[in-house]
């Protein structure tokens, strides 16, 4: 039960770091595919 209680404090920074990383990666792939640069 201790692990279950500590789950939100583990997932909040994980989501806060992983979601922007996925967003930036998909954005950079989208830019490379469209060849804006």
Swiss-Prot record:
Residue ranges of the TM segments: 7-27
Membrane topology: Single-pass membrane protein
Protein name: Photosystem I reaction center subunit VIII
Organism: Eucalyptus globulus subsp. globulus
KW Thylakoid (keyword) present: yes
Family per record: Belongs to the PsaI family.
Alphabetical GO biological process terms: photosynthesis
SUPFAM superfamilies linked: Subunit VIII of photosystem I reaction centre, PsaI
Entry keyword annotation includes Translocase: no
Role: May help in the organization of the PsaL subunit.
């Amino acid at each position: 039960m201790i692990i279950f209680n500590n789950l939100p404090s583990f997932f909040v920074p994980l989501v806060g770091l992983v979601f922007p990383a996925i967003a930036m990666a998909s954005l950079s792939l989208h830019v490379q595919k469209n060849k804006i640069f």
